[in-house]
Amino acid sequence: MGGAGCKEVKEEKRSSGGEDSLSSADRIRRFIIKQFGYNVLSLARRGLKDVPEELWELLELEKLNLSLNSLKVLPPHLARLSNLVVLNLWGNQLSSLPSEIGQLRRLRVLFVYRNRLTEVPEELGACTQLEVLSLANNQLSSLPASLSNLTRLRKLNLSHNHMAHIPGCVYNMKALVFLHLACNHLENLAENIQALVELKILIVEGNSLHSLPKALCCLTRLELLNLDFNDIKDVPQSHILRSQFVS
């Protein structure tokens, strides 16, 4: 009877010793799941004020969710996660993104909405595989010209920022099908809008638009144009003829 008890104690010690021998990175690694063929890790809603240092050792990560925490800074170590395809940072307190984000050359989806960004690093333009980018609910008044390189971008959300005009780089994003600019400070839409030939959804509600450019009629793929809560007094006759896409 006593021998059996002694054996149990030894087993317990061996078990706990194995746990202690794991590196911190390995402990986090156990939370990685395989989802649709991707290595996915979610640390959402963990009350994180800083990213655990060990996270930057998980080079195999392809999808990382750090949303709904209290992160104020992302360190340059982000560049180590060069296999990232999806990075979710929404609902934090980030005032900037590290320039090293430009080294994530495989990145296709980036969510940074509901943060405190006042600018976007030029280096983001190096992430030329990006297809979805949400920068909504920040404090942005412009975007760097380097984002003209995001020619594969299909969905761009810039709503709830401080944009007085559509950033020039947007007109080079020829693959855009969805452009959300609601609740900014836009007073007009430039004729350059006609460059976005693939655009299907354009949302500009809640701005200060007074008129519409004739160039909008060149967007033959447009299915939804939301102009609610503006001050539009001048609508070209050509728009009336295509009023089926106006919301």
Question: For the regions a protein language model found, what residue spans apply to each?
Answer:
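The feature captures the LRR N-terminal capping module
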Residues: 1-214, 223-224, 229-247
